[in-house]
Amino acid sequence: MLSYMLSQYARLPVPEVTLRSWLKQWLSEQESRCTDRSFSARFPLRETGLCQEYFLQRKLKIDGKQFLTGPRYQGGNINKPFIDIVGMDSDLNHTALELISKEWSQLRAQYVRILVPGQSFLQGIPDQYIYAASFSEPPEFNDKSLTLQVATYEDFDWCCQALGDAYKHTWQTVRELSASNLVAVDNEELCDHISEREVYIIYENDVRAGLLICQKGNLAFLRGYRITDKVILPAFRGRSLSARAQRLLYRLLTHSDSELSLYMGTIIPQNIPSMKTAERAGRTCILSYQFLPICRTHD
């Protein structure tokens, strides 16, 4: 699997030796979930009536090729199960897709999900795009009107209000986005992010204009710093503040322990404004999660 996946993701903005290390650890972790009962215990056993062992990941051999697969639920919704392919040593053809779906038939999934390079994949339905940049070439930043300040517990109420106001405005002004596909972190998550010093308040000329949430961690097999939320207050929109703030944070993180890692985040396909912002901030689409409808195996 490692050799195939190295060739599949060869154009990612990291050295081959780094990519190899990331993929080796990823495959090791995913294979351990074939026997890890603490992993299978996370799934809705009572609601589905399926035994715990059913939710262990499975390495399937199809026509001499291997596919490492596992059960998932889109957005945690029990009514939206899918099969995730987390490792493979061959392209996915119709025969493999059909046999994988048959193996997981009790899950009643309608889709198999794969992670492919770039943004376009003709056979798939996009789930999320991964926009990222390497810390090896940080952007220039000379915008003295913009500053970032790490939020404290005293800022909690303001952050809650800012998130609420910004999301409500987005739902009202961007037709493709709504509370059904774009939601902010909840209060408990926000509190956790503040305690971990992951919330940055954006100041323009010393006035609070929005916030960024950025945490160190993994995204699939990628490692680095992940932007998990970003909002600009309605009164401050239209001046590329989000992109400018992301460039500033990018620059600041470059001087921390960011070596051999990525500055990244996921964006849903309906969120065109965030894609444009990410590109202005120096990130490009390097990977995308794509759904393949299982019914196509019977075409």
What are these model-derived regions, one by one?
Residues 1, 5, 10, 35, ...:
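Acyl-donor-binding surface of acyltransferase catalytic domains
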Residues 1-37, 140-185:
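Short amphipathic alpha-helix that is part of the acyltransferase structural core
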Residues 11-104, 209-230, 234, 289:
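Conserved donor-binding loop and adjoining core beta-sheet/short helix segment
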Residues 92-102, 232, 238-254, 276-280:
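Conserved acetyl-CoA-binding loop-helix of GNAT-fold acetyltransferases
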Residues 114-121, 263-275, 284, 291-293:
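Conserved beta-strand-loop-alpha-helix junction that forms the acyl-donor binding cleft
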Residues 130-138, 282-298:
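Conserved catalytic-core motifs of GNAT/GCN5-like acyltransferases
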Residues 171-234:
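A conserved beta-strand-loop-helix scaffold within acyl/acetyltransferase catalytic domains
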Residues 228-231, 235, 248-253, 260, ...:
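Catalytic core segments in nucleotide and nucleic-acid processing enzymes
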